[in-house]
Structures are given as structure tokens and as C-alpha cells.
Amino acid sequence: LFPVPYEGILSLRFVQGIATIGAFSLAVTTLMDLGGGHGRNMGTAGLAIGLGTALGSPIGGQLYGLGPFVPLYAAALALFGAGVLATLATDRTPGSQSTTPLAIVGTLREQWSLAVPFAFGFVDRLTAGFFALVGTVYFQSELGLDAAGTGLLLGAFFVPFALFQYPMGRLSDRIGRIIPVAAGSLAYGLAVISVFYAPSVRVTAVSMVLVGILGALVAPATMALVTDIAAENSRGVAMGGFNIFGSLGFLSGIVGGATIAGRVSFEAAFLVVGLAEVFIAIVALPLLFRLDVPVVPWIEKQERLR
């Protein structure tokens, strides 16, 4: 059509990011308003997000073979269809306490406990950003994989991460959020480290599958924890704050991971990212037990029936 300067493309991407995160947060907030178990609902969101991420790259690659702009046209058409479907959803608009960008700060001040899932969300997305860039470079430069092999290894993570989120979300409705979030994060961090120390590509693939399953254990429980804590009239603000911290974590994983890998080593980068997950699990454990949410719901239910 006409040449666009690189700065213009970056500006367009910035606007696209604003629109995307806004629609994404509102879509998840709509699920927060539904009954039937917050873990199940957040697992549904995670299933959709994970499948989209897992299928986006291979489908985009096939469409690119038809032409460089075909993936963009197809994505625009898919987003338009999603927007039309969104008009059919039942909307719930309770009176909100505040609609300003600083509402997140006010919500955190009133409900300090939201900082706990926000912190977990930051570190969880940090690992995702880390694998998106540093993991890809590591697989190709250190393991000698080509683009197809790298895609298979990333798929070993994304497929179980997507498919297990719904059952893991339902599990958190039964056993509570604390066990999946704390124990899951601890095991998840160790699994991330195991990817580097895997002695072969096959073992690396197994480690990536384990990372995906454990990530699916943590992700819906963390989002459900936000839903459990947030007041009914501030769920949108709470989920928006969660996504802000998550996006900052994703960016930190890319920039921080690349910096450590470039200046120190891949081993140091994997250790820092994995131990960050372990650290947040250990440090936040006392805070998790102080939250006003059931630790083990089935035991508390039995005690109420006595």
C-alpha cells in the first residue's frame, strides 16, 4: 500500500497492545462474574488462552506461506468475529467505586491481599517471557535445533499448559487455591531449572511437558484467587491490575533473561528465573495462609456439617 516507518509500526503496536489488554481483561472479568466455581471459570479462560498461543504459531506459519500479509488479514477477521460474539454475552455493570487509571492503586490500598496473586502473576509471566525469547535461543544455539525442532519443544510446553488448565482449575475449586499456588509454584520453578540440566533433547522435551502441566496447575488457581479476594464491584480493576503485573513480568522475562544469558550464561539465566518462582512460593506462603479464602475447602465443609 504505502511505506510505513519503523517508528510508526511501533506506535501502531503500542495502540494495539492497549486495545488487546483492555479487551482481554474485560473478557476474563466476564468469566469472573459467572457462577459454578472461580477455578473452573479461570481454567476455561486459561484453556482458551493456551490453545490460542499453541495454535497461533503453526497456523500463522502456514498462512505466511500464502503471503506475508495473509496472517494479519486472518487475525483481523478472527478478532472481528470475536468482537461480534462478545455482543451476545450477558453484561453485568454494577456501580464501580472508581473508573480512573489510579483505581488499581486504590483497590490495592483497600485490599492489600491482592498483592499476593499479583506477585505470583508477575513471576509466572516472567517465566513465559523468558521461554519466548531466551528459551528459543537456547534450544537453537545450545541444543542445535532448527526452527521446526524448537517449535516442537515449545509445543511440548504449550499443549499441556492449555489442555490441563480446565481440570486444574476445577481441582482448585475442590482443594482450595493455596496448595496449587504455593506447592505448584515451587515445583514449577524447579521444573524450569530442570530444562537446562536435561542431558538430552528428549529429556528436555519431558521437562517442558512437566513445566506445562505445573504451569497449568498454578495459572487458573492464581487468577481464581484474584476473583476470590476482589470485591464484586472491583473485579474488573483487580483483573486489570493482575494483567498489568503479568505484562510487566513477561517484559522482565524477555529483557532480564536476555541480559543475564548474554552477560553471564544460559545456566545463570535459568537459575535466576526458576529460583524466582521458588522464592515467591516460599516468601508468600505465610501471606497465603492469612488470606480470607478456604485453605482446604472439603475439610472446612465437613467441620461445618458437624
Show where each model-derived region lies.
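Structural signature of the two symmetry-related core transmembrane helices
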Residues: L1, I179-S194
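Hydrophobic core of transmembrane alpha-helices in multi-pass small-molecule transporters
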Residues: E7-G22, F122, V203-L217
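Cytoplasmic helix-loop-helix junction between adjacent transmembrane helices
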Residues: L12-L51, A224-L225
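Helix-loop-helix hairpin linking two adjacent transmembrane segments in secondary transporters
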Residues: T44-L88, E267
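C-terminal membrane-cytosol helix-exit motif in multi-pass small-molecule transporters
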Residues: L77-G95, I280-L288
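Juxtamembrane intracellular "pre-TM" segments in multi-pass secondary transporters
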Residues: T90-F120, E300-R306
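Short amphipathic helix-loop junctions that connect adjacent transmembrane helices
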Residues: L133-A148
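A late C-terminal transmembrane helix in Major Facilitator Superfamily
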Residues: S234-V264
